[in-house]
Amino acid sequence: MARYTGSVCRLCRREGLKLYLKGDRCYTPKCAIDRRSYAPGQHGQGRKKVSEYGLQLREKQKARRIYGILESQFRRYFEKAERQPGITGENLLRLLERRLDNVIYRLGLGASRNEARQLVRHGHFTVNGRRVNIPSYLVKPGDVIAVRDQSKESPRIKELLERAADRTPPAWLEYEADQARARVAALPARDQIDAPVQEHLIVELYSR
């Protein structure tokens, strides 16, 4: 599937906040938004009034960029969220959180969602004992995600496992550091999703 291949630091500057797309670099003084907190481009430092539509569009773009999803796939997630019972915006975020690449990132087994996506594609993880290399795979309560035994010998995986052992995952994920595996305890509640997104604006945008 096609992916954005430009500078991810520009995306953070465009949205006006850290999206943590570059992993460890985002926590250092080298982070682009710390050095230049205005939008990229010739008129990036200019001030302009943003319309209601503009606010809604920016919120959708922000969500897409946080989770690293292209427009067509994001739209499909929204349509699926609409068909589910409950609040559409919360359903949307819940679907995005359940992506396997996001779960790996939340567990600390990827410094960024992009790295987590690459590790999933390279087949380093299993779900319920079977290797899964599809980043968009949606986990469900009761699923067990584990690092493959062969992958534990990789220097990068070893480093990530050490870091994950010191990290507290979201409450909907139960991580056993000594076994290098996690269990999906429940679907994530809205207050367990720390994505800085106003999902109601996305719903308003797609409802136009």
Curated annotation (Swiss-Prot):
Cysteine disulfide links: none
Q: Name the GO terms of the biological process aspect.
A: ribosomal small subunit biogenesis; translation
Q: Where is the S4 RNA-binding domain?
A: 98-161
Q: Name one Pfam family in it.
A: Ribosomal_S4
Q: Which InterPro entries does the record match to this protein? A: Ribosomal_uS4, Ribosomal_uS4_bac-type, Ribosomal_uS4_CS, Ribosomal_uS4_N, S4_RNA-bd, S4_RNA-bd_sf
Q: Name one GO cellular component term.
A: small ribosomal subunit
Q: Which PROSITE patterns match?
A: RIBOSOMAL_S4, S4
- GO MF, one annotated term: rRNA binding
Key words of the record = Ribonucleoprotein, Ribosomal protein, RNA-binding, rRNA-binding
Record-linked PANTHER family: 30S 40S RIBOSOMAL PROTEIN (PTHR11831), SMALL RIBOSOMAL SUBUNIT PROTEIN US4M (PTHR11831:SF4)
Oligomeric state and partners? Answer: Part of the 30S ribosomal subunit. Contacts protein S5. The interaction surface between S4 and S5 is involved in control of translational fidelity.
Q: Which HAMAP family match?
A: Ribosomal_uS4_B (MF_01306_B)
Q: What does this protein do?
A: One of the primary rRNA binding proteins, it binds directly to 16S rRNA where it nucleates assembly of the body of the 30S subunit. With S5 and S12 plays an important role in translational accuracy.
Family in the record: Belongs to the universal ribosomal protein uS4 family.
Q: What is this protein called in UniProt?
A: Small ribosomal subunit protein uS4
Give the organism the record lists: Pelotomaculum thermopropionicum (strain DSM 13744 / JCM 10971 / SI)
Lineage, uppermost ranks: Bacteria, Bacillati, Bacillota, Clostridia, Eubacteriales
